[in-house]
Amino acid sequence: MDLIEYFERQKQRCERELRYSEAPGFQLFERTPQGQHDITEQHIQELREARDQYQRTIDYLKTQG
């Protein structure tokens, strides 16, 4: 597997996870000593940023030939 293929797979993984995370009713919680916190929006934002970074990396690798 080359680098482009690796990053394309990672991007696809993010996109799949985003589909589930953006579904109505989906919630993601984190337990801390202070209690339970809803981190759904933070999780979605991190997935979007990762997906975009993977795409930038793919584009860069393609230009480098």
Language model: regions and residue ranges:
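Short, charge/polar-rich alpha-helical segments
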Residues: 1-16
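Short, charge-rich amphipathic interface segments used for partner binding and complex assembly
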Residues: 13, 19-64
